Amino acid sequence: MEKQPQNSRRGLAPREVPPAVGLLLIMALMNTLLYLCLDHFFIAPRQSTVDPTHCPYGHFRIGQMKNCSPWLSCEELRTEVRQLKRVGEGAVKRVFLSEWKEHKVALSQLTSLEMKDDFLHGLQMLKSLQGTHVVTLLGYCEDDNTMLTEYHPLGSLSNLEETLNLSKYQNVNTWQHRLELAMDYVSIINYLHHSPVGTRVMCDSNDLPKTLSQYLLTSNFSILANDLDALPLVNHSSGMLVKCGHRELHGDFVAPEQLWPYGEDVPFHDDLMPSYDEKIDIWKIPDISSFLLGHIEGSDMVRFHLFDIHKACKSQTPSERPTAQDVLETYQKVLDTLRDAMMSQAREML
């Protein structure tokens, strides 16, 4: 019988991959990995946070809580919350870092009975505006003039530069993340102007430090409105406008319509001071965004692309200023355009 060839018994011998083909495969794999890295760098998603709106009204969920809990009562605040240390004090409230069932929380107490109306207004706004743009309310006790909110260890937005200068946060100290912070801020203003309780104006904003102190920086680098003690209502249909306080304001941070219009020869009198609407918040957006953008690589490029919308925000005529929604849409377009351009340039270099 004729013998079968040796190769037929063992099967076909594997073909050797030419070195050039192997090199091409390696290069293709490297390009794929580089693209993934680029996508992560330029379109880095924020860490997801628990959305308090997933709980029904009057309930909350923080940290690793799986279920929603009702707002804490006076008795629960008195017996279950342990104060640790004071972390802040303003004209209306003093704030204590506290602990509730192994959760770090912020306990706010009224500083003076003279400020009780402001305290109760802030509490009512906090209750009415619960959602992704506002710090989470955990409970309150009007009898004790206290309220409990979620604690955010990075603190006030005024700490932004100090925080981003820390080495562990260098990866988020980019123009992309800073522009997203500016978008967060404008989103909050837009929410207040279209809130469930009408058009609200952020009145505690007569200078940059005061404005920044009204907001919190979260651990995933987003912004939350925190201090809602001065949110008067504007109602255009009924002609209801606002005045932020009863004192004369100065400087170019506040909108022109907030300044005394009758010159130095006429003494300031609150009854003669004209009222105004929510467009005072729009005037301040460029200054706050400039702070948030900082002075890092790429921030001036972003400012250049935002020049036109910021110029419109600074119109002397309030009605000619854009809405917060207009500003937000422009910010999104600039972010998308610059990010796409940088990704395209980076890929061309591969």
Curated annotation (Swiss-Prot):
It is a single-pass type II membrane protein. It is found in: Endoplasmic reticulum membrane. GO terms for biological process: brain development; carbohydrate phosphorylation; learning or memory; neuromuscular process; protein O-linked glycosylation; sensory perception of pain. Protein O-mannose kinase that specifically mediates phosphorylation at the 6-position of an O-mannose of the trisaccharide (N-acetylgalactosamine (GalNAc)-beta-1,3-N-acetylglucosamine (GlcNAc)-beta-1,4-mannose) to generate phosphorylated O-mannosyl trisaccharide (N-acetylgalactosamine-beta-1,3-N-acetylglucosamine-beta-1,4-(phosphate-6-)mannose). Phosphorylated O-mannosyl trisaccharide is a carbohydrate structure present in alpha-dystroglycan (DAG1), which is required for binding laminin G-like domain-containing extracellular proteins with high affinity. Coiled coil: none annotated. GO terms for molecular function: ATP binding; carbohydrate kinase activity; phosphotransferase activity, alcohol group as acceptor; protein kinase activity. Residues 81-350 form the Protein kinase domain. It holds the Pfam family PK_Tyr_Ser-Thr. Belongs to the protein kinase superfamily. Ser/Thr protein kinase family. STKL subfamily. Residues 44-350 are lumenal. PANTHER family: PROTEIN O-MANNOSE KINASE. Its EC number is 2.7.1.183. GO terms for cellular component: endoplasmic reticulum membrane. It catalyses: 3-O-[beta-D-GalNAc-(1->3)-beta-D-GlcNAc-(1->4)-alpha-D-Man]-L-Thr-[protein] + ATP = 3-O-[beta-D-GalNAc-(1->3)-beta-D-GlcNAc-(1->4)-(O-6-P-alpha-D-Man)]-Thr-[protein] + ADP + H(+). SUPFAM superfamilies: Protein kinase-like (PK-like). The chain crosses the membrane at residues 21-43. The modification N-acetylmethionine is found at M1. This is Protein O-mannose kinase.
